[in-house]
Every structure is written in structure tokens, then in C-alpha cells.
Amino acid sequence: VTAAAVWAVPAAAAASVQGISSTSCIADNANILSRDTETYITNISVALQENCSGAQIGVYTTDYVGNNTMEGYAYEVFQAWGLGSADQDNGMVLLMATGDDNYWATPGEGLESAFSGNVLSDLLYDNLEASWTKQDYDTGARKTVLAMAERICDVYGVSLDMDAIGSGLADSSGRIVENTQSRSNGGAVLTLILLTIIIAVIVIAILKTPRG
């Protein structure tokens, strides 16, 4: 499978765009992405939107694209979804069609220079192809979206640890998220140790006190 491949199903009707929402960057119609992966992608897309002039990445999955080409269907999804800033047209759609055993990505005009045909084909091959052949769609989607996001950050001169943001280890501005539960548990352990030491000191003092 390559990003530039064009598949068609002549006997099938044109597939309609389904499941998209202006409040979500995930449309998992094929039900192939885990909740953790959806959260990972959403976190990255939100960070892009906040730090890269409204840029967004959307992941759209389906079984088949009907008698559309992959390129044509991805463009329809892109137009219907309206990802990215309207004035900069800096959205990106990753289309994954499992029944057709193919994938495609379409950038908005504002990102076309950064994602030329060869660049985008190489990016998809390097980050999605190996996982795709194993039907490990979660890993493929994560790696591909991360690679896209890092390139978009380069376009806007933004330095963010997108993997940490996607994983929830950093917020959308890149600040490390403290694990309050671990801090709470650590404080409780420290308190217990101090109490144990104090009690031990008191017991030793009592034992050393001369009998009257």
C-alpha cells in the first residue's frame, strides 16, 4: 500500500462522508481506534490549534470509499470537516479505509508546501505502512499523526514535545503535568516515616530513663 495508490470499487455506490463533527478531530467509522489513541490524537490536534495558528489534524476511518478514489474521498472529507483555520487553510486529514486496504492524507492549501507529494508519501510510508500491514491501526495512526504534528510545528517555528502532549504528560502548551496522586502518596509515606522515627525516639528515651 502506498499513499499515492488509487483504489476503486466499481460495483459500489459512492460512499458518503459520515461521523464528522466540528467539535472532534476523530471520525472512527470503522471502529479501529482505541479510546487511548483517540485521546492521544485529540490532545495533539488541540495543541496544534492553540499554538500553530489554528492548524488541526483529523483522522477519518471507514471500511470502503465506494467508487470514489482515495484522493477524491479524502478531499470530500476535508471539505466537509472544515479542519484548520479558515483564513490559513491549515488543516490535515488522514483517511484510513480498512476494507479497501488503503490510506491517504490530504493537507489544506496552507500546508501544501510543507507536505508536497513526495514528502507526504514518505511520511505515510515511514510511519504507517509497517503497522498497516499488521493491522495495528492504533500504532500507525499515532505515529503518523505525531510525525505530521512535528512537521507542522516546524512550519510555525513552534517547539513542543508532541508525544508528551498526546500521552497526557504535558498540557497543550507543553508544560509538564504533575502527577498529584503520586505527590499525595509520596507525602503520606514521608509522614509515616517521620512518625515512626518520632515514636522510636520516644520509646528509646523512656527505656533509658533511670528507675526511681
Residue ranges of model-derived segments:
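C-terminal segment of classical bacterial N-terminal signal peptides
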Residues: T2-A12
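Folded, non-transmembrane soluble domains that reside on the lumenal/extracytoplasmic side of membranes
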Residues: A13-A188
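Selective detector of the "anchor" transmembrane alpha-helix that sits immediately C-terminal
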Residues: G187-K208
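Short hydrophobic helical membrane-anchoring segments positioned at the boundary
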Residues: R211-G212
